[in-house]
């Protein structure tokens, strides 16, 4: 082979090698491009899938949130529904209770005063009630009669005047508690010391939870007229309070026994330390105040005139007082009946006979219900001075002498 042939053959070979290499490079590039495309496609597919997953997740979260909202709304609606049901149940229960209360009140209205006040159950007497009444500290005297217009307030007022000067225990005070909603004693005493306001405070001592602090807030000093005596006044508004207290008690809305509220106040140790005598002026009927007075009293005094229209109510009152003693206050002592409004001038034989018959009616009632009690020897005559001035014993020597005799007799029975 010649050199030219060799060179030509070599060039052909090189040319052929470059072409193969180029083809190889092109092939490699093509494979790389395919791989890149595949990677790009894979990436893009993953992006699309990721976006779809995210979108799907967002949709699911949106649905879950909506479900939660619906559930919350449902629960709130259920709560509201339950609340409405409870309110309806409460209203229904209240209606039933009111209907039951109405039936109870209708039954009570058919009963006598004695059934309402004395036989009412349950009896929630304070544990130490009987012991405190028996110790007679202080003496608590109820001046009472179911008949009005018999001089009851005049007797109470002039007794207060006597004991203001003649203390049972030196150094202690007296208290006049006016439980008569007409407020006669309160009017006379407040007028005497220039107090013009007519305000009832007696109901404070019969409210649920009443204590000696209520007494100290309610009392009024009577200096200089009765310097050692204090007053708890009453007026017509007392009657409204009494009726409300009675209804609450009968319907079971109070947590204690209404009948013993005054007793807890008057027989507290601190009250016994301050007062030796409490005089209670009671109304002429069996009220919340009257029954509280009977349950709180150590002694009972009954003023009455000896007439046909007055004697029979006295017999009924003594029967009721005996029932109170037997059921509610066994240590209550009946000290006697004082005749009031006795005629001072000449009277007809018919009037004398009527008076004697009335006296006999009272004596028989005493013998039946309180055989240890009697009619006081000293009577209280009908006098203009006593009609015009409730505290006549302060100004009229004759009236003063009458009450000195009567109160001395009474004092001898305060044991």
What positions do the PLM features span?
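Extreme N-terminal, non-catalytic leader segments
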Residues: 76-145
């Amino acid at each position: 082979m010649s050199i030219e042939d060799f060179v030509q053959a070599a060039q052909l070979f090189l040319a052929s090698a470059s072409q193969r290499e180029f083809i190889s490079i092109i092939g490699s590039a093509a494979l790389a491009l395919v791989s890149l495309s595949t990677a790009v496609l894979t990436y893009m597919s993953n992006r699309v899938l990721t976006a779809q997953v995210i979108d799907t997740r967002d949709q699911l979260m949106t649905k879950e949130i909506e479900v939660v909202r619906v559930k919350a709304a449902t629960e709130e609606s259920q709560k509201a529904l339950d609340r409405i049901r409870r309110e309806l149940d409460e209203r229904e229960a209240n209606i039933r209770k009111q209907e039951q209360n109405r039936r109870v009140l209708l039954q009570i209205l058919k009963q006598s005063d004695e059934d309402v006040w004395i036989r009412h159950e349950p009896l929630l007497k304070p544990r130490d009630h009987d012991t405190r009444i028996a110790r007679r500290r202080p003496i608590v005297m109820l001046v009472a009669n179911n008949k009005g217009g018999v001089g009851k307030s005049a007797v109470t007022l002039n007794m207060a005047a006597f004991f203001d000067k003649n203390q049972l225990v030196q150094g202690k005070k007296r208290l006049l508690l006016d439980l008569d909603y007409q407020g006669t004693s309160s009017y006379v005493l407040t007028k005497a010391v220039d107090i013009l306001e007519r305000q009832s405070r007696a109901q404070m001592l019969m409210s649920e939870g009443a204590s000696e602090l209520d007494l100290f807030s309610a009392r009024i000093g009577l200096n200089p007229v009765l310097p050692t005596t204090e007053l708890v006044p009453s007026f017509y508004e007392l009657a409204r309070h009494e009726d409300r207290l009675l209804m609450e008690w009968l319907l079971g809305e109070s947590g204690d026994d209404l009948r013993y509220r005054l007793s807890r106040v008057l027989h507290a140790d601190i009250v016994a330390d301050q007062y030796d005598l409490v005089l209670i002026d009671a109304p002429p009927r069996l009220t919340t105040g009257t029954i509280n007075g009977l349950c709180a009293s150590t002694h009972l005094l009954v003023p009455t005139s000896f007439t046909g229209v007055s004697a029979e109510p006295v017999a009924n009152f003594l029967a009721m007082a005996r029932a109170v003693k037997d059921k509610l206050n066994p240590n209550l002592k009946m000290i006697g009946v004082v005749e009031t409004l006795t005629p001072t001038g000449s009277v007809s034989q018919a009037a004398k006979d009527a008076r004697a018959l009335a006296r006999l009616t009272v004596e028989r009632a005493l013998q039946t219900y309180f055989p240890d009690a009697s009619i006081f020897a000293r009577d209280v005559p009908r006098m203009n001075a006593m009609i015009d001035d409730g505290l006549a014993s302060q100004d009229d020597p004759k009236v003063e002498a009458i009450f000195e005799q009567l109160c001395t007799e009474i004092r001898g029975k305060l044991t």
